Amino acid sequence: MCIRDRHISGLATFHLTVVPSFDGGQVFIEMQDSETGIRLGHATMDVRYHAGGYEAQTVIPGQTITMLMEFQGIDALLPAGHGITFVLSESGEDYLPPACTPSCSMHIIPSVSTVEIPVIYRDGSNVLITPQGEDAANNQ
């Protein structure tokens, strides 16, 4: 929990350490305001693209890998006192489940997974002020 509002802005990343049971499957992560349940952002990734890029890689069942996940761009205000909840599933409400379901499960290792969330702090001194000419409407 934070004692002041947080402005989450940009591309949050989640490096999720998993042990897949199959050469296939996916992870869907939803970031929520823990007080209201409002969805702040989401990320999804097929395990075969765990290293990023456009080429699928063969995944060896039982091998520990890190999925380099990136959330869709976020621009959200998280009020003071609110926390963040991450909900993980295999498909989420916006995506179809993988073709190999239910045989392509993954064991997630949260203790070595990391998340980075870009936050902008505003204190009044760093607010964007656009230069105005003397004839600008807000100077009249």
Residues covered by each model-derived region:
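Sequence context surrounding c-type heme c attachment/ligation sites in exported
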Residues: 1
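Glycine/threonine-rich phosphate-binding loop and adjacent beta-strand/alpha-helix elements that clamp
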Residues: 4-140
